[in-house]
A protein has these predicted regions:
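SDR active-site strand-loop-helix element
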Residues: 19-25, 67-69
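NAD(P)-cofactor binding segment of oxidoreductase domains
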Residues: 1-20
Length: 154
């Protein structure tokens, strides 16, 4: 996430073109929910830390747009989903038009592209009816899973 982003950023700066960086809701630790663009980042996973580092680099270029978002493909990819993890992610066919609209705007800085806040389990049931509910406490990923990564809609 960092090296590739640096290479693209360098090209954008040299060419004088706008840099659009797709980031993630995971730059937050999930302790609060309804995160706003100016809330302090506090990543917990290795992936989130790399996205945070790349974001900090992109912020140095004034002609840039950082879009924080999160989405699944067209279906929910797992057999189980957390009932106690909150999100504002959605499916790609819902999020893509919102993302493209933001990219095509004149907006610069940091922007959140999100959907309604709901549990991961509720989101899963929209496209997959045979999902088993589960709890965060039942799994060990080597770090504390974020409980609420919902983003405030803009």
């Amino acid at each position: 996430n960092v090296v590739g982003t640096y290479n693209i950023l360098e090209h954008c700066v040299q060419s004088g073109i706008k840099m659009v960086y797709i980031s993630t809701d995971a730059v937050f630790d999930g302790s609060m929910g309804f995160y706003q663009a100016d809330d302090p980042m506090s990543p917990v996973s290795k992936y989130a830390k790399s996205k945070t580092a790349a974001e900090l680099m992109v912020r140095t270029y004034e002609n840039s747009l950082i879009i924080r978002t999160s989405f699944f493909g067209e279906t929910f990819p797992y057999d189980k989903a957390f009932v106690d993890q909150w999100t504002s992610k959605d499916y790609i066919d819902i999020m893509a038009p919102k993302i493209f609209s933001k990219i095509n705007s004149n907006k610069k800085g940091i922007s959140h592209v999100s959907s309604n806040r709901r549990s991961l389990y509720e989101l899963a049931l929209i496209r997959k009816k045979d999902v088993t509910p589960c709890h965060i406490r039942d799994y060990d990923y080597g770090f504390e899973l974020p409980k609420d990564l919902s983003l405030k809609q803009e």
